[in-house]
Amino acid sequence: MVGVPLQWFLKDDFDGKEILWNLFRELVYYRELKADYAYYCNRVSFFEDAAQGMRRLMYEAVFSREARDEIRVRAFVQHYCHTEVASLFYLFDAVYAFHYVRNRAPYYTTPEGSALLASLYQKERGVYWEHTETALHLQFAYALAERVLFHDMPKGCNRACIARDPVVQEVLRTLVLGTEMSNFIHSEFFPLSGEVVPTKHRDRIVSVFLLEHFVRLWHLSVANITFELKNITDRSYDPFRNERAFEYTKSNLHAVHSRDGQQELKKREDVFESCTTQFDERFSISPKERKEFARLLRTTHRLRIDMRSFWKSLIGKSVQWIDCYEGKCPKGRLNVGDFVSVFPDFQEFRGRDQRYKLRVYDRVYEVRACTLRPAQIEVSFVVDNSGSMNKEKIASAREALAVSMLSLKDFGEYSDMLAAGRRERTTIHSEVYYFGSSFIKVKSFGKSKSKDFNSAQLIKASVNLDGRFGGTNDAEVLKHILADVERRRARVSSDTSFVKVVLVITDGCSSYPHESRRTIEELRRRGVMIFGFQIGLMSPEETALFHDVWNSTEELGLLLGERLEYLPRELLRTLRVVLSKVHRLSSGERLHAQRVW
């Protein structure tokens, strides 16, 4: 809601239709102010800079050298020049507002509406416009404004032109970038596309193309005028008359912008909260789960940002280019050997002015290298949910799981963005298993599911780890993954079209270590890259058993112990190494698990 004082129009004896027009015009000014309040706060400084040339000329042409340093003289000159220059910019603000309202209110394009605007124009013009001795610079400004205002008005509109000096008429005929001045201003202020032209851009147009003529004509007008200083002791060049009023206006502008910004932010927050609530209700995500996931996002934000930078660099480097050379081309780099061999023909072609038909040039160009990338990358997270997982271990595992899945999601999005420029497409998916005495899949790959469904599963898999599954039977879940890999290998066309990565997080040694070791070795023979991460304090016997399972032939297991805060970083570092190796894969090469720390 915008309030405009009605007495602004009553004192000018406007009727109802004219008041309505002026209300529309004031709303245009308000829209301009709201669109770029910061520029309006500093517009006075812009006018001061624009008036520098006029102030210099006034000092030189009007006042004696002895009087230039007087405070009264400086105040008068600054105020006078500021007022004159500002009037030019404010005039074309009014011109823009005039057209803005007219183009958006169909009534004012009709003959009746156009006649109303013409009569209102003459009423606002007043006696000042009819004065035959108007200063040259004001004749120029108002005459140009009139031409722009009535650029496309119907011929029936009655409009009177003020008397113009021949010098002014000559300036108005000046071409700007090969176009008549009024047509140029009209095209810049009112483009055919209908786009809104910001105040800053309009001020630049006026400053660059009109201000010079305005100041020159002003100089011709005041060259023979005698100025007298009367009652200007406390006069200021500030259009707000005093600093206090100016600061008050600026504070109001800042308050309006701050309020609008807060309202816009609150509106976005309300929309986001509404969408989040609908999402949670749709997929049965409790407020407790949402709160815990928000905590995980905050605590792992820095790690995720670092991984995004790494993914962008990795994917960018994965696109390889090779130089190709082509000879005997009509253009390019001259091949001296070819030129010597066809030199007799060259002389003949030269006489016929056909020498450019000779193919004696080499051309070098780049083509994208055809490299073989895996069509699918699958990452399985196997997380210990046994009773020995205490609060600290669960929190660390949740953070590691959340940031890893989110980072893989980011990697997949970046890879999809680049897919349009590559001959192959690589998709990446993740799944999550909780294991204890038995195991359960809490997140599937979701290849045929919607993005919302996959996001909901990611949230639940990140926050539902609670340590309620009893023992530590990791062998069973690893056998399940092995069986799935065997089925998958039978369906893929080659070993390099499918890459499988398994990351196991556990807080102790396996309940069935021998079965676990045999399954891990079998997975490695199948080309699966598998790694284990141990968290929590263990006895020497348990440590030896862990090494026997994971590091008997090759070091695939990492003992973190009580350094729980390192788990998210080490998990992400492993993903970095693995996916870096995947993107360096060439045709015919097979992936094998190897030590990454």
From Swiss-Prot:
Residues 378-575 form the VWFA domain. Gene3D superfamilies: von Willebrand factor, type A domain (3.40.50.410). InterPro entries: VWF_A (IPR002035), vWFA_dom_sf (IPR036465). This is Uncharacterized protein TP_0246.
